[in-house]
Curated annotation (Swiss-Prot):
InterPro entries reported in the protein's UniProt record: CsbD, UPF0337_stress_rsp, YjbJ_sf
Recorded family membership: Belongs to the UPF0337 (CsbD) family.
Protein name: UPF0337 protein XAC0100
Domain of life: Bacteria
Source organism of the structure: Xanthomonas axonopodis pv. citri (strain 306)
Amino acid sequence: MDKNRIDGAAKQVKGSVKEAIGRVTGDKSTELEGAAEKNVGKVQRKAGEVADDVRDAVKSTK
């Protein structure tokens, strides 16, 4: 499993928590930072999935 999948998933969770804290406390800045971090995590996780798919495809052609 590609490291980006794990790191991306962790960023998504951290971003979701930060976003929720911002929403609950009324801190729009924290809420937006959390949403941004969550989206960065989604992209990173997807990049890891693509890397895994490419790696698997290369292995299957050998």
